[in-house]
């Protein structure tokens, strides 16, 4: 099969937060695809290997409102929408850099209808 390049794709994701009993599932644009990486056969303790991952380059932010949140809980959740993507180092502050993670549409709580 042909490896897809790093690019924005449409994906179903979920958002949820403490104090809101329901998870909201919807379509948005995320970065996905393959980046060329190198893994040297000789690893020196003095060398550092950097793996590049498919990550956001340009984004816009959108906000959704979660239903049935408790009084005093802000029902709004803001998330990035991928406009363009790039193969770059993974930034833990903004990206899921785990080797294995949950599906983007996984909900811990009940899904909102």
Swiss-Prot record:
GO biological process: G protein-coupled receptor signaling pathway
Localization per record: Secreted
GO CC term (a single one): cytoplasm
Keyword NAD recorded: no
SUPFAM superfamilies: Cystine-knot cytokines
Main subcellular location of this protein, as a coarse class: secreted
Transmembrane spans: none
Domain of life: Eukaryota
Keywords: Disulfide bond, Glycoprotein, Hormone, Secreted
Positions of glycan attachment: 10
Cited InterPro entries: Cystine-knot_cytokine (IPR029034), Glyco_hormone_CN (IPR006208), Gonadotropin_bsu (IPR001545), Gonadotropin_bsu_CS (IPR018245)
Described purpose of this protein according to its UniProt entry: Involved in gametogenesis and steroidogenesis.
Similarity comment: Belongs to the glycoprotein hormones subunit beta family.
Subunit structure: Heterodimer of an alpha and a beta chain.
Protein name in the entry: Gonadotropin subunit beta
Record organism: Muraenesox cinereus (Daggertooth pike conger)
Lineage: Eukaryota, Metazoa, Chordata, Craniata, Vertebrata
Name of the gene: cgb
